[in-house]
Structures are given as C-alpha cells and as structure tokens.
C-alpha cells in the first residue's frame, strides 16, 4: 500500500549506481502504481462492496511489456483477472486469464448460434457469451437461451455446465441490461449473470450497479 506524500523506497549507493537505477526504478514504480491505483478505484477494493472487474487493456497498452505488466498491476489493484493470456503465462495463476468471446469470433461462423455452440463445446465450464454482435433482443438473447437449453439437455446432471453470463458491449448499457435481465428472468434463467463493457470507468460503473451486473470489463 502506498500513501500520498509518504516515502516508499529509499536507496543508498554510490552516485553512478544511483543514476543507473533511477530511470528504471521510477518507470517501474510509476507505471505499476498508476495502473494499480486506477484498478483500485474501479473495483472499489478499498470499500465495503468491491466490484468484480476484469482487465481488458492490452490492446491499448503502450507495447507488449506494458500490456503484461499492466495486467499484473491491475490484478494487484483488485481486478479478478485479465484478457491477456500471455500475462497469465508470464506471472502464473495469480494473474488469471478470463473473458468472454469476441465479435470477430462470432462473425467467423455461418450463424450466431453456431459460434455460441462452438465456444460452449470447447469451454463448457465457463460459457460467457457476447450478445450484441447483431441484435441483442432479436438474435443474441434467443440464441443464448437456445444454447443454454442445449447444455441442459447435453449435461443434465452437471449444473456447472450452463451459460454463466451474458455480455453487452454497445449501446445504452443501462437500458439494455435492464431489458436483458427482465427477459432472462422471464425465461427461467435468473442464474445467468450480466457483464458490461465498453468505455466504462468508476463513475459509469457506480451508475450501473442498480442493474445487477455480476462483472465489468474495462480496457
């Protein structure tokens, strides 16, 4: 934990050694503390009700090392995991790779349901689907319900192999989430959690917490 205006590190050495280490040390500490501090604010780690937030920032990071180190710092700041699989390989299970499915993956298949089914057949224990590639209520939601029914039929005695969550990544996230929650409950699937992403920060997340999101993705 770092506090404002409180010395974090004191290094005593000769002048040449101090000059050589200064840039690297400051770069490392400043970058990691920047990301970890932002993650703490977003996750509410320092509050009584921390949020479940996944780090998705690698595509916007300033280079590969920043993407990996940023994922590590975000987890230190309270994020539950990262979309960066390389970061998990580098740092181990502490920096867990998590996430849903991409628009590009869904568009690769002949139909949205084909994409959902392929993902579920590959990762039956962690099915989290993106619903807004085409149309949330007219396409994404019906196909999600169809897939969950398929999993129930395929694994009748394994309640862990169900659709875990549904993600919205565009439009009015609050309004869309409210409609989706109502529709899922009406379909008898209250166990499917909501995930929101796209341009979120701590203020937007605070305004959306009324809509019962299980997770947020930021990056």
Predicted regions and their residues:
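Buried, small/hydrophobic-residue-enriched core segments of structured protein domains
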Residues: 2-191, 200-212
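Structural detector of well-ordered beta-strand residues that form the stable sheet scaffold
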Residues: 128-130, 195, 217
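Glycine-rich phosphate-binding active-site loops on the catalytic face of alpha/beta enzymes
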Residues: 212-219
